[in-house]
A protein has these predicted regions:
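Juxtamembrane extramembrane loops of integral membrane proteins
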Residues: 49-117, 477, 482-493
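Extracytoplasmic
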Residues: 143-253, 264, 492-495, 548-601, ...
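Short, hydrophobic beta-strand segments
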Residues: 78-89, 136-141, 175-185, 433-445, ...
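PDZ/PDZ-like domain segments forming the peptide/carboxylate-binding groove
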Residues: 600-651, 655-658
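Juxtamembrane segments of multi-pass membrane proteins
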Residues: 411, 416-541
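Solvent-exposed, non-transmembrane alpha-helical starts
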Residues: 76, 89-100, 129, 186-195, ...
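Membrane-embedded transmembrane helical bundles of large multi-pass transporters/channels
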Residues: 1-50, 54, 68, 160-161, ...
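Alpha-helical transmembrane helix bundles of large polytopic membrane transport and channel proteins
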Residues: 97, 101-170, 176, 183, ...
Length: 889
C-alpha cells in the first residue's frame, strides 16, 4: 500500500518510484533474477585469453608494416633460449648436442614459425664454405649431432669466422649460445607455449653445468598465465576482509550481505556481457572486475547507511525508510554511476582493440550497478527482516563515529581550514615538480608486468648481458622496382643506416643484406679484409647474392629478401624497451631517412615563420629533363635541377606543406610507393609545379619487431592521453552540471579530483610506473573514484541546508552522515585494494597499490578540501537552497 510523503516537489517522483518498485516487487525480482541467471551462465563460459593483435593500434603505419612483413622478416613474438655453461665453453660434444636437441625441440612447440628459428644447430643459419675447385656454397653450421672434440673445434672455428653468428648466436666468451624462435601471431597460445617450452626445451637439458634462460613476449605472457591463480586467491582474501569490515561497521549481517548482493549481481552482468558479445578477459585486467565490484559495494554501503538513518527517523517504519533512502540517494548514486561509466568510454579514442573492448564492457558493467543498486535495492530491503533498533542506535555510539566527529571538528575549525588549504597547495606544488617524470611507455629495461627478481626478468637480463641486444626493431627497405636490393647505392644506404643507429647507446648491433654482401665478397677474395665492402655495380652484387643463396630453399632466403629482390630489411637489436629510448631511436631513424631523401634530391631545407624554405641546392646532384619530368643523371649534358634556393615548398603530391614537420610527414607519405613525385613550389610570387623521378631505388619504412609495435602503441597513447583526460573531466562536468543545475558545482567537485589526479601521476613518476596499454584503463577508471565521494557529500549538504539554512551547519552535518559512510567505504576499500600488492604479478601489485593510493587521496580531498571550499566560498548552488524549507513528514 502506497504512503503519502511530504517532500520537496523535485523529490516526489523518486518517492513515487520507490513505492512502485515495492508494489511490483515480484515481477521486477523475477525479471532481474532471470537476466542475472542468463548472464551468470554466460559468465561461467568466459575464458582468460590474450590476443596479441588486439594489443596493437591496427591503424598505425608501423603496425601496418609489421603485419605485412611479420611472417617473413620476423615479428614481435620471439622466444629466446640461452644455453650457458658454468665451466668451460659450449664447444664440447655434450653441450653442442644439447643445443642441437633443444633446437629440434623448439621446432616442435605449438605455433612456431619453422623458417624463423635461428640457432647454430638450425638449417637456416649458414656460413660460406669454399669447396675443392674454388666453388662456394652456404652450408649449415651443424649438420647433425657432434661425436668428437675435433668436430666441436671445427664448429668453433666456423663460428669465430662468421660475422652473422659470433657475438649474435654465440657469446664472445664462448660460454653461451642463443636459440631464437619466432611465433606465428595468429596461433599464439601463451599457456601452451609456456608449458611446452618448459617440458621439451628447458627441463630435459638443465644440469649442474648447464643453465638455461628463456625470455621473449610469449614467455612473458606465459608467466602471467602461470601466476593467474595467485590473483584469484588475492581476490578472495580481499573480499573476505572487506565482508568482515562491513560487519564490524554495521554490527549486523544485513550490512555485510546487502552490498554483497549488489556486487555479485553486477559481476554476473559484467562478466556475462563480456562473453555474450564474444570478448575475452585478459589476465592482466583481472584487477578491473575487482575495481568495478568495489564501486558497486561502495554505493551499496551508502544506501545501507542511509536506510538505517531513515529507519530511525521514520519511527522504525521499514517501508517508509526504504523509500526515503532510495529517493534521497537516487541522484548522487545515479550521477556517480553515470560519470564512472561514461568516463571509461573515453578509452574508445585509443585505436587499440583490447582497450576499446575494455571500454565497452567496463562501461556496461558499471551501468549494470544501477540494476542491483537502484532498481533492486528497495525490493531486497523489503524482503529482508528489519534491523533491531538497538543495532541501528549503536552505530552512532561506536569509536568510528567518535573519530569521525573529532576529525570533522578539527577540519572545519578556522585553523583547520587554513591548514587544509596550505596542505593541498604544498602538495600540488610538490606533485607538479615530480609529475614531469611521468612517461609514456615502459620506464625500465625489465618487464613492468613481473617483479625484477622474477625468473623471467632474471633470464631477460642474463641474455641481455651476454648478447648486448635482443629486442628487435625491423625497418623495411621496399624497392620501387624489381632487383632494387641489388643496387649498390641502396646497400650502402643500409650500411650507413646501421652505423648511424649503432652509435645510439640503446642499440646493441644490427643486421642487413649489406652484412651478407660484405662477408661474401671478403670470402670470395680469400678473406682479404679490404674486400669486405659492397661492390660498385649491380652485376657483382647479384653474383654474390647468387653464391650465398644458391642451394637454399626459398623459405630460408625469404627471411632476408623476397624472391624478386624488391624488399629486404634492416634489423636493429636494442638493449631495452624503455619508452624514452624507443622514442629516441625512432626519432633517429626518421632523421636518417629524411636527411637521406634530401641528400638524394640535392637540397637542404629550413623553417621560416611556419613555412618550409629550400635553404641550399647541392651542385653534386645533376639533373636532366625527360619530357615533363626531371631525373638525376650522370650524363655530360646534365645540369642544375628544378629546385632553386629560396623556393617555398607548398605541396608534395596531394599533401599540403606548412612547417618543417608537415614537410617531413608529406615526404614520407607521398614517397612511400611512388616513383614520380610532384612538388608545388612558390617562386617569385607564383607557384611552380614540377615532377621529379625518385632518385632512390628503395624507401625505408618504419617499423616492425617488438620495438616497432611498442613505438606504435606509445605514439597512440601520447597522441590521445591529453584528449582522454580532457574529455573524461568534461564528461564529469556535464553530468554534475545537470545534476545540480549549476555551472559552479562541477568546479567544486572536479577541483579536488584534479589535484588527486596530479598527485597520483606524480606517484607514478616517482615509482617508475609508465602509461601504457595495460595501465591506461585502470588509471582512467581511477579518475572517477573521487567524484562519487564528493557527490554524496554535496547532495547531503544541499539536503541539510534546507533544514538549517546555514552553510557551516549543513556541511558539518553532511560530513557526519554521508561523510561517515564515505570514510568507511574509502578506508575499507583502500585497505583491501592494497592487498593486491601481495600478487606475484608485479603489474597487478603496483596497480593495486596505485589505486589504493588513488582512493585514499580522492577520499582525503572529498572530506577536507571540498567542505572547506564550500564553507569559505559559499557557492550560490548551495546558498540558494537555504531559502527552501524542507517539509516535515
Amino acid at each position: 500500500m502506497a504512503m503519502e510523503y511530504q517532500v520537496a516537489e523535485e523529490k516526489r517522483l523518486l518517492y513515487w518510484l520507490g513505492e512502485r518498485l515495492i508494489d511490483y516487487r515480484l515481477p521486477v525480482t523475477i525479471g532481474v533474477l532471470l537476466l542475472t541467471g542468463f548472464f551468470a551462465y554466460c559468465a561461467f563460459q568466459l575464458r582468460l585469453v590474450t590476443s596479441f593483435g588486439e594489443l596493437l593500434p591496427q591503424s598505425h603505419p608501423y603496425i601496418k608494416i609489421h603485419n605485412r612483413f611479420a611472417g617473413t622478416f620476423g615479428g614481435a613474438n620471439n622466444i629466446m633460449v640461452m644455453v650457458e655453461v658454468k665451466e668451460g665453453t659450449i664447444f664440447t660434444p655434450e653441450t653442442l648436442n644439447k643445443i642441437w636437441r633443444m633446437t629440434e625441440a623448439i621446432d616442435t612447440v605449438y605455433g612456431v614459425n619453422h623458417n624463423q628459428i635461428e640457432s647454430i644447430a638450425h638449417r637456416t643459419v649458414r656460413y660460406l664454405k669454399v669447396a675443392a675447385g674454388g666453388t662456394m656454397r652456404a652450408t649449415p653450421v651443424m649438420l647433425g649431432e657432434v661425436k668428437t672434440q675435433e668436430q666441436a673445434d671445427e664448429i668453433r672455428r666456423i663460428v669465430h669466422s662468421a660475422e652473422n653468428i659470433y657475438g649474435i648466436l654465440v657469446s664472445l666468451d664462448d660460454k653461451a649460445a642463443l636459440i631464437r624462435a619466432n611465433f606465428i601471431e595468429g596461433r599464439l597460445d601463451y599457456r601452451r607455449i609456456f608449458d611446452e617450452v618448459n617440458e621439451r626445451v628447458v627441463a630435459p637439458y638443465r644440469d649442474q653445468n648447464t643453465e638455461i634462460f628463456v625470455a621473449g613476449e610469449p614467455r612473458l605472457y606465459g608467466w602471467v598465465y602461470h601466476y593467474a591463480s595467485d590473483v584469484l586467491l588475492v581476490f578472495v582474501l580481499a573480499y573476505c576482509i572487506e565482508w568482515l569490515l562491513r560487519w564490524l561497521y554495521f554490527h549486523d549481517w544485513r550490512g555485510a550481505l546487502r552490498p554483497t548482493i549488489t556486487g555479485i549481481i553486477a559481476a554476473f552482468w559484467g562478466l556475462g556481457f563480456i562473453e555474450l558479445i564474444g570478448f575475452s578477459l585478459d589476465p592482466l585486467m583481472l584487477v578491473m572486475p575487482f575495481l568495478i565490484t568495489a564501486r558497486a559495494v561502495s554505493h551499496s554501503v551508502q544506501m545501507h547507511d542511509r536506510y538505517y538513518e531513515e529507519f530511525e527517523r521514520h519511527g522504525w517504519n521499514k517501508r517508509r525508510a526504504i523509500v526515503a533512502a532510495f529517493a534521497e540517494l537516487f541522484v548522487p548514486t545515479f550521477s556517480g554511476i553515470t560519470t564512472d561509466a561514461l568516463g571509461v568510454l573515453v578509452i574508445l579514442l585509443v585505436p587499440v582493440v583490447m582497450l576499446q573492448k575494455l571500454a565497452i564492457t567496463a562501461s556496461f558493467w558499471i551501468f549494470a550497478i544501477t540494476v542491483s543498486e537502484l532498481l533492486l535495492n528497495p525490493i531486497v530491503y523489503y524482503y529482508l527482516k528489519a534491523p533491531e533498533p538497538e543495532i541501528v542506535l549503536v552505530r552512532d555510539e561506536g569509536i568510528f563515529r567518535r573519530v569521525v566527529t573529532r576529525a570533522v571538528d578539527a577540519i572545519l575549525s578556522r585553523r583547520g581550514q587554513l591548514a587544509v588549504l596550505a596542505f593541498w597547495l604544498v602538495a600540488a606544488g610538490v606533485a607538479g615538480y615530480f609529475v614531469r617524470g611521468l612517461i609514456i611507455g615502459d620506464p625500465t629495461s625489465a618487464s613492468p608486468l613481473l617483479w625484477p627478481d622474477s625468473p623471467y626478468n632474471v633470464s631477460h637480463q642474463r641474455i641481455q648481458d651476454k648478447f648486448g641486444g635482443v629486442e628487435p626493431l625491423i625497418v623495411v627497405a621496399e624497392g620501387l622496382d624489381r632487383d632494387a636490393m641489388k643496387d649498390p647505392a641502396t646497400l650502402r644506404r643500409m650500411e650507413r643506416f646501421q652505423r648511424t643507429l649503432e652509435r645510439d647507446p640503446s642499440v646493441g648491433y644490427s643486421f642487413s643484406l649489406a652484412d651478407i654482401i660484405r662477408a661474401v665478397n671478403s670470402v670470395f677474395h680469400e678473406l682479404e679484409p679490404k674486400w669486405g665492402v659492397i661492390p660498385n655495380n649491380w652485376v657483382d652484387v647479384g653474383g654474390l647474392f647468387f653464391i650465398y643463396f644458391s642451394g637454399s630453399p626459398p623459405t630460408e632466403t625469404a627471411k632476408y629478401v623476397d624472391p624478386s629482390y624488391t624488399t629486404a630489411h634492416v634489423t636493429f637489436f636494442c638493449k631495452d624497451h624503455k619508452g624514452e629510448n624507443i622514442r629516441r631511436i625512432l626519432r633517429r631513424c626518421k632523421d636518417f631517412i629524411f636527411s637521406g631523401q634530401l641528400e638524394d634530391l640535392g637540397i637542404e631545407v629550413e623553417e621560416d615563420k611556419g613555412r618550409t624554405i629550400i635553404s641550399s641546392v647541392s651542385n653534386a646532384v645533376r639533373w636532366e629533363q625527360a619530357g615533363p619530368s626531371w631525373l638525376v643523371s650522370t650524363a655530360e649534358h646534365a645540369g642544375p635541377g628544378p629546385f632553386q634556393r629560396g623556393d617555398r615548398i607548398v605541396r608534395v603530391g596531394r599533401t599540403p606543406v606548412g612547417d618543417l614537420a608537415s614537410f617531413r610527414s608529406a615526404l614520407t607519405v607521398e614517397t612511400a610507393n611512388a616513383s614520380l613525385i610532384d612538388f608545388a613550389l612558390e617562386r617569385n610570387g607564383s607557384v611552380v609545379e614540377i615532377t621529379v623521378v625518385a632518385p632512390w631505388k628503395a624507401v625505408f619504412k618504419l617499423a616492425g619487431g617488438l620495438i616497432g609495435v611498442l613505438a606504435a602503441a606509445n605514439e597512440e597513447l601520447f597522441r590521445n592521453d591529453v584528449l582522454m583526460n580532457v574529455l573524461g573531466f568534461a564528461t564529469m562536468y556535464v553530468i554534475v552540471l545537470f545534476t545540480y543545475r549549476s555551472f559552479a558545482a562541477p568546479l567544486f567537485l572536479l577541483g579536488p579530483l584534479m589535484l588527486a589526479n596530479l598527485l597520483v601521476n606524480a606517484y607514478m613518476a616517482g615509482r617508475n610506473i609508465g602509461i601504457n596499454i595495460h595501465t591506461l584503463p585502470l588509471v582512467t577508471v581511477g579518475v572517477g573514484f573521487g567524484i562519487d565521494y564528493g557527490l554524496y557529500i554535496v547532495s547531503r549538504a544541499i539536503e541539510e541546508i534546507r533544514s538549517s539554512g546555514n552553510v557551516e551547519q549543513a556541511v558539518r552535518a553532511a560530513l557526519l552522515t554521508s561523510g561517515k559512510a564515505v570514510s568507511f567505504t574509502a578506508l575499507s576499500m583502500t585497505l583491501v585494494t592494497a592487498l593486491w600488492s601481495l600478487s606475484s604479478i608485479r603489474f597487478n601489485a603496483e596497480m593495486g597499490s596505485l589505486l589504493a593510493l588513488w582512493m585514499a587521496i580522492s577520499y582525503v580531498g572529498a572530506v577536507t578540501l571540498l567542505p572547506v571550499l564550500l564553507i569559505r566560498l559559499r557557492p550560490r548552488f548551495l546558498v540558494r537552497e537555504a531559502a527552501k524549507v524542507a517539509p516535515q513528514d
